[in-house]
Amino acid sequence: MPGIAVAQQKSLKDQIIGSWTLVQAVDTQADGTKTNPWGANPKGAYMFSPDGRFAQMLFHTDLPKIDNRMGGTPDQNKAIAQGVVAMYGSYTVDEANKTINVKFEGSSFAKFAGTEGKRVITSINDNEFQSTNPATSTGTKADSVWRRVK
């Protein structure tokens, strides 16, 4: 019909580009048990650039506050090592399967470097997306909610 404009839907890649902050993270074990691996109020950032680069950081709610990052007790250092994950690399988007495929170039968890991962986008709009990591390094399925930084 003349005079009727049809809005084109954005691609998943166009929707995901930008900076996001972590709202919720829940891991599900094989037996169905759910845990909050990053605490009750997790902190984190996820950034996707238009040229296919990403960076992600996850922080536990209750990290020890130490005066010198080169110091700390063994227990404090262990809590920090277990309570922080940062990674970066490149990504591609599989529009048909609604997945983000990541190639880790570096990570605070050194085992990730040189590996690949998949994040299934289960829901997305202009302000929020939900994703699932079907196979974490701890053997769980991780579901997370991210809100766009304005």
What is each of the regions a protein language model found here?
Residues 3-150:
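Lipid interaction determinants
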